[in-house]
Design a protein with these regions (language model features):
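Short, surface-exposed beta-strand/loop micro-motifs that present aromatic residues
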Residues: 73-82
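Short, isolated positions in well-ordered beta-strands
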Residues: 12, 87-88
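Secretory pathway targeting signatures of secreted, lumenal, and periplasmic proteins
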Residues: 2, 7, 13-61
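Short acidic, gly/pro-rich beta-turn/loop elements at beta-sheet edges
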Residues: 22, 65, 99-100
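Short, Gly/Ser/Thr-enriched beta-strand-loop segments that form substrate-interacting elements
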Residues: 57-74
Length: 124
């Protein structure tokens, strides 16, 4: 049965390779013009929880600040809120594991994250 992640204005079908091995952590960062919210998605591999992807949400003022300071920001943007005031970015991590077996697991989980491109819905 397909499970859905639906929290903090983000919705997507959880990839089969993540089922039963999935942690989403909501975080708030910074203040003022640098404040933003992020949801970090991790999976357990070996003895560690390993970050797989991050979806961040930036208000208009914060978005302009981030775009000015990071040339990659615009490339990572995948959606805006319905009112156009919140900008969402998607970052797929590229971690290196200590063992070949753990790396194969990570690569499978990362590929599942990449398959979400274009399938993540912003609900607000």
């Amino acid at each position: 049965m397909q499970k859905t992640y639906d929290a903090h204005d983000i919705r997507f079908d959880i990839p089969a390779d993540w089922q039963g091995n999935f942690l989403a952590e909501y975080q708030q960062h910074g203040e003022g013009d640098t404040a933003y919210e992020a949801t970090v998605f991790s999976c357990h591999i070996g003895q560690n929880d390993v970050m797989v992807m991050t979806i961040a949400a930036f208000g208009e003022k914060q978005w302009e600040t981030i775009k000015a300071s990071s040339p990659d920001a615009a490339k990572m943007e995948f959606a805006t809120s319905k009112d156009g005031k919140t900008h969402y970015t998607l970052r797929i991590e590229d971690q290196k594991m200590d063992t070949e077996a753990d790396q194969k697991v990570y690569d499978t989980i990362r590929a599942a994250a990449q398959s979400l491109s274009g399938k993540i819905t912003i609900t607000k």
